[in-house]
Amino acid sequence: MTLRTQVSDLIQSGKYTQAELARKIGVNSGALSAWLNDKYKGKAESIETPIKNWLELNERKTKIFVEAPNFIDIPTAHKVFNSLDMARVLPTMVTVYGASGVGKTKACQAYRENNPNVWMITASPARATLSSILYELALELGINDAPRRKDRLSRLIVKKLKGTQGLVIIDESDHLPYDALEEIRIIQEEVEVGFALIGNDKVYNRIQGGVNQAHEFARLWSRIGKNTPIKASSKGDIKAIAEAWGLDSDDKDLMNVLNSIGTKAGGLRALTQYLRLAAITAKGQDSAIFTAE
């Protein structure tokens, strides 16, 4: 099979578009098109060498790569779903907070994929100011040519959200400062859609100060309809993950090992990495089953 045929077959299979393949290979899409049609005027090796390198890399990845299950229906996910449902139905604001690596983000992503009018953004140190987080939300809502001015952004977001009966999820919201949280509160009240603040304990601890009516967070605290703490992964979570990977959850020795990993901070994330490495090892040994060893 010629190099040109291999590339053509990949595109025709629907796995990649020509533009996607060109990006992965690291060549210009127009140049790749010309080469495929035997009309490329430049040096053939300038296209063929990166193609060969990418095909070899892709083959190596195929031999060793093991993809983790995209979403596993764990008990913790249902705690998150219940809070998100409440935020949307009432509508109100909720918090889901606690340890990292316990499945909060994955559950929110699954909820967004399976429900209409759910938008999810992620705060970060670089995207935590009031103007930055409003801009992120505007982009997520599909507002084209979103302005950078805070007042215009806020008005456009309100206009877009009104009447949607939707839900806005803000992950890593522990990064958000007071003025950003206050603006979110005001928007939520005006448009009457649900808002969910997801993050670590800082999300709750800061807002909880509002239980004192003299505290700056008092107005925000009084609008929170539900606070859902997730302090650690449960054994039910770990059992569901083991079964999703095709492991025997009745194997006590195996489950003891998995529980010792999964119940620590960042447990489910670490557990997934361990299982992936174990699966790669098993794949290399042509073994269908991997155990605690």
Language-model-detected regions and their locations in the chain:
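Mid-core helix/loop region of P-loop NTP-binding domains shared across ATPases and GTPases
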Residues: 129-133, 144-183, 189-196, 233-241, ...
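A short helix-turn-beta junction within AAA+ P-loop NTPase domains corresponding to the substrate/partner-engaging
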Residues: 117, 210-231
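Pre-Walker A adenine-sensing motif
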Residues: 71-88
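Conserved catalytic segments around the Walker B and adjacent sensor/switch elements
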Residues: 115-126
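C-terminal alpha-helical "lid" subdomain
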Residues: 1-53, 235-293
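Conserved phosphate-binding/catalytic loops and adjacent sensor/switch elements of nucleotide-binding enzymes
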Residues: 124-139
